[in-house]
């Protein structure tokens, strides 16, 4: 596991900004690729208003695009305690076929050994508690993944102020999702449809994959003022051999590596740090916390959405493009009514020198 990237002490307030509520996208657009896209040149601090459909114009034959193919599970469950009190369960991470780390919203803290009845069908026992996270054992013959698929609800982020609908089961999932395990979508990937993927392949851009199962910790706020005191959540990732080979070939030919989403970037950069600057196929876990001053070793460009104030993701993009460049970009996005967060618009960022 990794938790490095901070060069000097910075304050959470350095990453704060005011966002009008009406700019928080509550629904996806009619078509995935209808999103706007703000191009940000970190080298020259330039901005350019574009559309996501223009993405191929910024790429060339031999470049690679790295997508996170994790699949969002229906991680939200409602139920009652044995005493009758209501509970809301959000799976944070699946541990094995019957156990998971979860966040629980209830009127009072749960007691170790107590049981819950979820969705009127599933009995779960509280095995352990570590701060805000509980470990639940789901006492059912079906594996947990199948239980969630049958009885769970799409885990929309807390800033989307509505219940999930049947439509969200499709739209809060990328078209290339394969490996079940995430409890939040890798949202930069939501802009892609099959037409865009085929257009990029025809252009000669290589599309490759990593898997990083996004945890509920991605929504947790930074609660400390000095960011070097923040404890980053841990997420599992996997990098296939063909991805390593494609990136090595791209780099040797002078191409650029575009990471789609902060999760793809963190998987690649974590692997590089773990292996002394070498990209190695295999699985690992990361709690890499990237802030200004971090040296990016492999990713040249980043496609990402607009992130929450005071968040670790905003700190990451500030490291990638430069703090002043990102402040300028976010002011521009707000002034020009870009849509923010999971169902919002995109940024394409060229890294700073």
From Swiss-Prot:
Subunit structure: Monomer.
GO molecular function, one term: S-adenosylmethionine:tRNA ribosyltransferase-isomerase activity
E.C. code: 2.4.99.17
Stored InterPro entries: QueA, QueA_dom1, QueA_dom2, QueA_sf
Reaction catalyzed: 7-aminomethyl-7-carbaguanosine(34) in tRNA + S-adenosyl-L-methionine = epoxyqueuosine(34) in tRNA + adenine + L-methionine + 2 H(+)
Entry protein name: S-adenosylmethionine:tRNA ribosyltransferase-isomerase
Entry's family note: Belongs to the QueA family.
Pfam families xrefs: Queuosine_synth (PF02547)
Function comment: Transfers and isomerizes the ribose moiety from AdoMet to the 7-aminomethyl group of 7-deazaguanine (preQ1-tRNA) to give epoxyqueuosine (oQ-tRNA).
Compartments, as annotated in UniProt: Cytoplasm
Pathway participation: tRNA modification; tRNA-queuosine biosynthesis
Biological process annotations from GO: queuosine biosynthetic process; tRNA wobble guanine modification
GO cellular component terms, semicolon-separated: cytoplasm
EC supergroup of this enzyme: transferase
Keyword terms: Cytoplasm, Queuosine biosynthesis, S-adenosyl-L-methionine, Transferase
């Amino acid at each position: 596991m990794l938790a490095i990237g901070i060069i000097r002490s910075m304050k959470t307030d350095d990453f704060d900004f005011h966002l009008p509520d009406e700019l928080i996208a509550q629904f996806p657009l009619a078509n995935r690729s209808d999103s706007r896209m703000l191009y940000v040149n970190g080298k020259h601090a330039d901005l350019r208003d574009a559309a996501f459909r223009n993405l191929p114009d910024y790429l060339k034959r031999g470049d690679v695009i790295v997508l996170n193919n994790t699949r969002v599970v229906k991680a939200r469950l409602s139920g009652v305690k044995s005493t009758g009190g209501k509970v809301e369960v959000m799976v944070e991470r699946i541990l094995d076929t019957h156990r998971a780390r979860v966040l629980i919203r209830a009127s009072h803290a749960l007691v170790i050994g107590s049981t819950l009845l979820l969705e009127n069908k599933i009995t779960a026992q509280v095995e352990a508690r570590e701060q805000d996270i509980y470990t639940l054992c789901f006492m059912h013959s079906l594996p947990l993944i199948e239980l969630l698929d049958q009885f769970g609800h799409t885990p929309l982020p807390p800033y989307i102020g509505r219940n999930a609908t049947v439509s969200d089961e499709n739209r809060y999932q990328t078209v290339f999702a394969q490996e079940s395990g995430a409890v939040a979508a890798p949202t930069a990937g939501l802009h892609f449809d099959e037409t865009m993927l085929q257009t990029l392949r025809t252009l000669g851009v290589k599309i490759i994959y990593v898997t990083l199962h996004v945890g509920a910790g991605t929504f947790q706020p930074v609660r400390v003022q000095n960011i070097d005191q923040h404890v980053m959540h841990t997420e599992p990732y996997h990098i296939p051999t063909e991805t390593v080979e494609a990136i090595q070939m791209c780099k040797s030919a002078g191409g650029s590596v575009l990471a789609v989403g902060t999760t793809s970037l963190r998987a690649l950069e974590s692997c590089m740090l773990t292996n002394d600057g070498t990209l190695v196929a295999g699985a690992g876990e990361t709690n890499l916390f990237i802030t200004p001053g971090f040296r990016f070793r492999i990713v040249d460009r980043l496609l990402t959405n607009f992130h929450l104030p005071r968040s670790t993701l905003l700190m990451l993009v500030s490291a990638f493009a430069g703090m002043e460049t990102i402040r300028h970009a976010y002011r521009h996005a707000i002034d020009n009514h870009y849509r923010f967060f999971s169902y919002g618009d995109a940024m394409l960022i060229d890294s700073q020198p």
